[in-house]
Amino acid sequence: MIKKIFGITALVVFSGFATAQELAVDSVKVEEAAVAAHDDEEGKPLKLHHAEPLYIDLMRDLGARKGEREWNVAMGVTENNGYYELYPLVEYEWAVADRLGLEVEVPFNVYTSAEKLPHKSPGTGVAGIKTSIQYTFLVNKKAYTSMAIGYLNEIELNSFRNYGNGKFFTGNVYNPFFVVAKGWGKTHSISTMVYAGPVFTHHFGSNHVDADWQINSSIHYLIPNSRNFVGLEVNKSITKERFNMVLRPQIRVALNDNTILGLVVGV
């Protein structure tokens, strides 16, 4: 889902074990991968190398292999008229079988100056519990294309200040999605991806359901003989009343065999 965070995001990945910390200014991501993401390893299921966008990431890599896993601890920061909104989160994702990935995420909302909060703003607390599943049903080396389907479910929780004054569970978000990625050119150095699906938000208090479409597209240039890339991610949200779009230029640089740094700017 699209987060309302603008600024620069730094992403660091360590193979073996990693922790990620994402601030609107910088973030760290830690990854433990049991298998490398190359498509030419003998005796292992085919897995193509696609550039995964840095802002809206996947549950697991497309074509994930059993045993891959990753911890993420992140934080987003937004300044709003004299107070700050913090969005820390913790997530764990793993491949329980070849091409099948699961993820559990717990996001938080933290406000630094409660007396300045807008009347309708949520209070500090656990924002919800997200669970998701993703299955890669196509990995075609000849076309250098991978496709996946998945489902994300989020149970929304009441803020700390409203515990005891209302329902503990305030809503539920239903988000089925489809992902397609393709490499272009003789060396597949141009990588494109589309991640799209409807989002239905059920508000338990009013029993009302909001619906919108999220379409996230990206294009990256994979620098030959490296894990580096440069590219652009475009996050779009469409409803009957409005169309929102954020452009996110980004770059990823491998600092060494175990560390990757990614930078994202929201425009």
PLM segments and residue spans:
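Bacterial Sec-dependent N-terminal signal peptides
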Residues: 1-27
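Transmembrane beta-barrel domains of Gram-negative outer membranes and organellar outer membranes
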Residues: 22-267
